[in-house]
């Protein structure tokens, strides 16, 4: 599974992409956030959005067949 990070998250994580194999008990988007957030606390921010294979999700969503998980910082505008 590929994890990608955009904007300030890329800076806070220190890279734009990580290849990983989550443990078996990490089976949805929220458990993945908690698992990787243990290493990169910026990802625990509830305003960070998650996209699974280019589809924004909210709440726990299964990740069994997902190839890419993107972590997106909040967008500001004016």
For the regions a protein language model found, what residue spans apply to each?
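Ubiquitin-like/PB1-type beta-grasp interaction modules and other compact soluble beta-rich domains
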Residues: 1-77
């Amino acid at each position: 599974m590929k994890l990608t990070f955009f904007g300030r998250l890329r800076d806070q994580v220190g890279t734009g992409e990580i290849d990983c194999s989550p443990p078996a008990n990490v089976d949805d988007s929220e458990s993945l956030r908690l698992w990787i957030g243990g290493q990169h606390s910026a990802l625990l921010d509830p305003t960070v959005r998650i996209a699974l294979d280019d589809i924004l999700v909210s709440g726990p969503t299964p990740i069994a067949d997902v190839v890419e998980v993107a972590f997106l910082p909040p967008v500001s505008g004016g």
